[in-house]
From Swiss-Prot:
The entry's keywords: Decarboxylase, Lyase, Phosphoprotein, Pyridoxal phosphate
E.C. number(s) listed in UniProt: 4.1.1.-
Enzyme class: lyase
One GO molecular-function entry: pyridoxal phosphate binding
Gene: PDXDC1
Keyword Zinc: no
Region named Disordered: 28-51, 684-788
Pfam families: PDXDC1-like_cen, PDXDC1-like_cen2, Pyridoxal_deC
Organism name: Homo sapiens (Human)
Domain of life: Eukaryota
Biased composition (Polar residues): 738-750
Stored InterPro entries: GrpII_AminoAcid_Decarb, PDXDC1-like_2nd, PDXDC1-like_3rd, PyrdxlP-dep_de-COase, PyrdxlP-dep_Trfase, PyrdxlP-dep_Trfase_major
Protein name: Pyridoxal-dependent decarboxylase domain-containing protein 1
Length: 788
């Protein structure tokens, strides 16, 4: 491209193309460096400040732009903020720079150039999309073209609108018909732009019995038109869909065109399926859109072109009305909106344009054919063979549910059962969509909620493939990832009802119905002081659930646990995640209940012990104070004087009554240390009993993870394996009971020889009576001599 720039005679154009290429390359290189860096910190250039007195060069300015673009990224890896644009993208970006440069030409040159650009682009688009004798309006906002078309229809049907204004509309109100499957907010946008009240909008329902549930009901539309005419209203405009915003279904445009011609209604068509008009084979429903009065298209996403305007093609013979409606303009700068698309179309050519749309349609067909072979995947566009949009969802019939159930409640199913099954599948589909978007980001998959079907996954390569560079291998990887996630989805869905029944049958546990959770279920432990009538959070419950989460994570099972909800004002719950294998729900619930109960008991014991210790410390302080006062009375005041006290203690030592004090945590009292010295002298060690371990978990084989169902009843086990399994269990039981037997044997061996020795008995009796032992007297007398 650098060599071709040298051939340009105008040095300004050559310099512009060179600068644009260098700027884009600099931003892309800096983006790659930013992605390679870990933990990028905010630099001083990102902080707003005053305008510098001296100017900066272009490299410094672009560096500042790059810092502003990537300085606030999170630490977690995210999708690139700048799409990987190729040469055709550079041409589209160059169009905006050229537009600013061309606007500086003199008026005559500017008029000729803009007229040529607008006429060329209009002619090319009309021929590509089979729209004969049409005009084009280029606009940045996708809905702006429809608003201009509505103004044109109003001026065409109300001849006195220019003079009388809205008084004409008041006498005969216009009606704009929108499909129930239209994109959200379209009707409100039109009313705001046109200044019409909301009663001027008429929402046409979709089919309910025959045909797609996302297609406009033509018979009902005709009935609405007749009713409006009888009420003195004027049917003005009908917005049809060639590919609805949700699932990509196409209305029966041929029937709608006949109906509009019969009642004099303007027919406007929009939708992603209009791109297939450029292909050699087009379905009859989409081909009928070429005969409509106007249609809006978005070639930018279809071709992967950044900053390319949307296009509205229309047919009208009165230039004055189109000028009043705003579809045409006398300003040359307004005509320059087509410049980026004009450059890009010339760069791609007709073959490149058609090839991109064809590639996107082939990706959709490839995914649709592959998903038909996958179990538990329901495709919502099977009747739309030519649709470039594929919408699917995971769906598995639960035991006891009606196999006819799809989205409409079946009479023999209770509403609660239908809703529970629907919410369960919706949560699982949301989880599946998030997983697929992370595993296959090039697929451009989106998650959406439909009113009838529920949560679904949409694959629309026409809107994403050119930008993300989606290939056939990405579609195959997407199908493989779906198949790998199906066992987890099926296992989780089957365990939900069993988990709920086990929780409801367990005392102290409450099942929480959270439709947005995709895991096995949500459970809450109700402690003794829990206020069941209130949903506000309590600190005790939060501590119990936090300890429960820690204990469960220490088990190293395949399940994931978390504490919720995210709203801090609500009571905390335990969320059990997805199940990748056959989980024993009974053991899981029993473990949760037993662990939570143990944590609560330990917390109660700790609270009681704290209170006992606090009271014991207070009593001990009082006793120590009394002992200090008694010692003062017994020894006298003179012994407390340093010099005098030493002399008195030298000649008349004080006989100590106690060797020390110890604080008993269990009783919360201050005791003497004499028993400890007695036991030390005898050498009698105390054997503590083994700590009892909880028996809430069943015995498992070595290497078997918690919460797994046992395979004792499996026919695949041979006699040898079963015998070895029994021997392993016996060894485990023998090892677990070993310390207790050893302790019992040791205690019996020490206790059988007979009663305690006489010396030990005498010492104990002497201690209990408070009479000092002769040996103690001897040691007390020799104390001062040794000091001397």
């Amino acid at each position: 491209m650098d060599a071709s720039l040298e051939k340009i005679a105008d040095p300004t154009l050559a310099e512009m193309g060179k600068n644009l290429k260098e700027a884009v390359k600099m931003l892309e290189d800096s983006q790659r460096r930013t992605e390679e860096e870990n933990g990028k910190k905010l630099i001083s250039g990102d902080i707003p400040g005053p305008l510098q007195g001296s100017g900066q060069d272009m490299v410094s300015i672009l560096q500042l732009v790059q810092n502003l673009m990537h300085g606030d990224e999170d630490e977690e890896p995210q999708s690139p903020r700048i799409q990987n644009i190729g040469e055709q993208g550079h041409m589209a970006l160059l169009g905006h720079s050229l537009g600013a440069y061309i606007s500086t030409l003199d008026k005559e040159k500017l008029r000729k150039l803009t007229t040529r650009i607008l006429s060329d682009t209009t002619l090319w688009l009309c021929r590509i999309f089979r729209y004969e004798n049409g005009c084009a309006y280029f606009h940045e906002e996708e809905r702006e073209g429809l608003a201009k078309i509505c103004r044109l229809a109003i001026h065409s049907r109300y001849e006195d609108f220019v003079v009388d204004g809205f008084n004409v509309l008041y006498n005969k109100k216009p009606v704009i018909y929108l499909s129930a499957a239209a994109r959200p907010g379209l009707g409100q946008y039109l009313c705001n732009q046109l200044g019409l009240p909301f009663p001027c909008l008429c929402r046409v329902p979709c089919n309910t019995v025959f045909g797609s549930q996302h297609q406009m009901d033509v018979a009902f539309l005709e009935k609405l038109i007749k009713d409006d005419i009888e009420r003195g209203r004027l049917p003005l405009l009908l917005v049809a869909n060639a590919g609805t915003a949700a699932v990509g279904h196409t209305d029966k445009i041929g029937r709608l065109k006949e109906l509009c011609e019969q009642y004099g209604i303007w027919l406007h068509v929009e939708g992603v399926n209009l791109a297939t008009l450029a292909l050699g084979y087009v379905s009859s429903s989409v081909l009928a859109a070429a005969k409509c009065d106007s249609m809006t298209m978005t070639p930018g996403p279809w071709l992967g072109l950044p900053a390319v305007p949307a296009v509205t093609l229309y047919k009208h013979d009165d230039p004055a009305l189109t000028l009043v409606a705003g579809l045409t303009s006398n300003k040359p700068t307004d005509k320059l909106r087509a410049l980026p698309l004009w450059l890009s179309l010339q760069y791609l050519g007709l073959d490149g344009f058609v090839e991109r749309i064809k590639h996107a349609c082939q990706l959709s067909q490839r995914l649709q054919e592959s998903l038909k072979k996958v179990n538990y995947i329901k495709i919502l566009v099977e009747d739309e063979l030519s649709s470039p949009v594929v919408v699917f969802r995971f769906f598995q019939e639960l035991p006891g549910s009606d196999p006819v159930f799809k989205a409409v409640p079946v009479p023999n199913m209770t509403p609660s059962g239908v809703g529970r099954e629907r919410h369960s599948c919706d949560a699982l589909n949301r989880w599946l969509g998030e997983q697929l978007k992370q595993l296959v980001p090039a697929s451009g998959l989106t998650v959406m909620d439909l009113e009838a079907e529920g949560t679904c996954l949409r694959f629309s390569p026409l809107m994403t493939a050119a930008v993300l560079g989606t290939r056939g291998e990405d579609v195959d990887q997407l199908v493989a990832c779906i198949e790998s996630k199906l066992p987890v989805l099926c296992c989780t869905l089957q365990l939900r009802e069993e988990f709920k029944q086990e929780v409801e049958a367990t005392a102290g546990l409450l099942y929480v119905d959270d439709p947005n959770w995709s895991g096995i279920g949500v459970v809450r432990y109700e402690h003794a002081n829990d206020d069941k009538s209130s949903l506000k959070s309590d600190p005790e419950g939060e501590n119990i659930h936090a300890g429960l989460l820690k204990k469960l994570n220490e088990l190293e099972s395949d399940l994931t646990f978390k504490i919720g909800p995210e709203y801090k004002s609500m009571k905390s719950c335990l969320y059990v995640g997805m199940a990748s294998d056959n989980v024993d729900a009974a053991e899981l619930v029993e473990t949760i209940a037993a662990t939570a109960r143990e944590i609560e008991e330990n917390s109660r014991l700790l609270e009681n012990m704290t209170e006992v210790v606090r009271k014991g410390i207070q009593e001990a302080q009082v006793e120590l104070q009394k002992a200090s006062e008694e010692r003062l009375l017994e020894e006298g005041v003179l012994r407390q004087i340093p010099v005098v006290g030493s002399v008195l203690n030298w000649f008349s030592p004080v006989q100590a009554l106690q060797k020390g004090r110890t604080f008993n945590l269990t009783a919360g009292s201050l005791e003497s240390t004499e028993p400890i010295y007695v036991y030390k002298a005898q050498g009698a060690g105390v054997t503590l009993p083994p700590t009892p371990s909880g028996s809430r978990t069943k015995q498992r084989l070595p290497g078997q993870k918690p919460f797994k169902r046992s395979l004792r009843g499996s026919d695949a086990l041979s006699e040898t394996s079963s015998v070895s399994h029994i021997e392993d269990l016996e060894k485990v039981e023998r090892l677990s009971s070993g310390p207790e037997q050893i302790t019992l044997e040791a205690s019996s061996t020490e206790g059988h020889p007979g009663a305690p020795s006489p010396q030990h008995t005498d010492q104990t009796e002497a201690f209990q009576k408070g009479v000092p032992h002769p040996e103690d007297d001897h040691s007390q007398v020799e104390g001062p001599e040794s000091l001397r």
